[in-house]
Amino acid sequence: MLGTKFILNIFKNKFNNLSTRFIKYVIKSYKRTCPHISDFEPFSSMYYYTGLHNYRTFYLLIKINEIFNINKYKQIYIIVNTDKYDFTTDDIETNKKNRIYLDQRVDIKIRQCDEVIRINLFTTKLTKKVHIGEIKIDINASIISKCFPKNEWFVCIKDGQEVCKVQLSFYKTQKYACPSECMFIHDGLEIWKDKSKSGSTKKIDINNIHKNFDDNDEHLAMIDIDTDINDISLIQKLKLISFVLEQEICVFDFYAYVLKYMYAKEIMGEWFLCFLCFKNNKDQEEINIETIIERNIHRDINIPMLNIQRIVVDKRNNTNANIIYTYQDEKYTLSIHSKKNLYYIIDAITIFTNDLKILKESFGDELEYRKNIIMKENTMKKLMGKRRLSSPRFRKNLPKSTHKMIKEMYDEQDCSHDVKESNTQFFENDMKTNEIKNDNIQTDEIKNDNIQTDEIKNDHIQTDEIKNDNIQTDEIKNDNIQTDEIKNDHIQTDEIKNDNIQTDEIKNDNIQTDEIKNDHIQTDEINNDHIQTDEIKNDHIQTDEIKNDHIQTDEIKNDINTSNEIFFKAQLENTIQNI
């Protein structure tokens, strides 16, 4: 009798287990096949506004960061369940370690009627699936009311006992958006808000070029979890993802991995991925070419973002990766190492480069225009920031009388210093002009032969023509347009060519004809050609003299213009400093 009762109890327990499993399977299949009434309008709005449901349908990205106290198993996998949907992760190799760093992401749809998310951990033994434990997460209490928490620990329980702990992060995504991009934007927003509270953020000027170039901090502060990703400008996306890339990472330099500070920064309108030796170096606004090409432990490394081709993960070690980029048609590689966030960093760099390429392909001209504006602003800041009084914090502590004394002292020093500089520059320019004149006289003497100088002295008509040229140069001096000075030289040569009066004077000049007859080359040219253009071409003396006169006049004009510009700049700097 005892044996039969024992056997009957075994069958009864098996039947109860099978029946309960069957009932659960039927209910689960019914929920998955048959939709809930709240999935359709207007019932979904009725359920929401009457208070039966606490939230609308949305998409949730669950990021599994870390598992603690899972050293009993070699390999596990995770299944995330809701009432209708489930998602299975890849196999995770634990190798019997106490702490595992992961980057498993699960994108799942949360309906209005869903109340709980179940996260189940499984392992395999030969062909058998073994359940490790389960995590139950209340959607309203643990996720929505806490504004989608990040890096929060949850306890995995089986049969009322704690098995392990899992660190999770939750992100609200959109239907037609990339989940990873939404994740980086939300992380960047949290980092930016923390920085704005501490006051360490750097304000970027607004350039009203296009809506995708909006980088105003006030508009950035209006972005939240529910903001449509299409309403965020591309510059704002780049700015937020750059905050995500700001972290410490190991970089391989020659023979070892060295800890450096990674930072994505816009310098003079171009984005660079910087690996800095010291965190304080991120305020620099110049990039040295040697830091792009050379790999040195004691030097910063700067990589242009648009030159990054791909990032390859090492097959032997999942914590190492190689960044392959080009510069001046040559390939370079940089090895990075991270135990916790390697895949997170790789995805952030790839999404950043893709958004930057889209911005350049779609708005190339506007991007160049913005770059020019930033370069002009930086040059103006350098000019305006050379001479400042004291910091605003120091000014508040000073009394008014001392503040006035300091200001007057700096103003007097600036005025005297600027006047001295302007005077010295003006006298230096005068000395240079005199030296240039003397050099021109010497070159003219070397070029002109002794016979040609005698002909110039005896030729009164040519001197009259040179005087007329001087009158023309005086007219050019009164002309304010500098670009027309070069054109007037050609006009003057054309006037000399077309001047019939000069040809008649040369024909009627008996002295010059006697001198030209003695010269066989000049008599043949005058007899065969009555046009003065051929005379000017063949007569090297006249053309050289006229050209030298024009060169001298142009040099004198340029010296006058430079002296005027220097004096004007000195006045402008004085007015700026006084303001």
Curated annotation (Swiss-Prot):
Biotechnology: Antibodies against CERLI2 severely reduces parasitemia, suggesting that CERLI2 is a potential vaccine candidate.
Cross-referenced InterPro entries: Rhoptry_Surface_Assoc
Disruption phenotype: Impairs merozoite invasion of host erythrocytes at, or prior to, the formation of the tight junction. Merozoite development and egress following schizont rupture are not affected. Inhibits rhoptry bulb RAP1 processing but not secretion of rhoptry neck proteins RH4 and RON4. Causes defects in rhoptry morphology which are narrower and more elongated. No defect in microneme secretion.
Topological category with respect to the lipid bilayer: Peripheral membrane protein
C2 domain ranges (all copies): 52-84
Annotated coiled-coil segments of the chain: none
Compartments it resides in: Cytoplasmic vesicle, Secretory vesicle, Rhoptry membrane; Cell membrane; Host cell membrane
Role noted for this protein: Plays an important role in rhoptry physiology and thus is essential for merozoite invasion of host erythrocytes.
Protein name: Rhoptry surface protein CERLI2
Gene symbol of the encoding locus: CERLI2
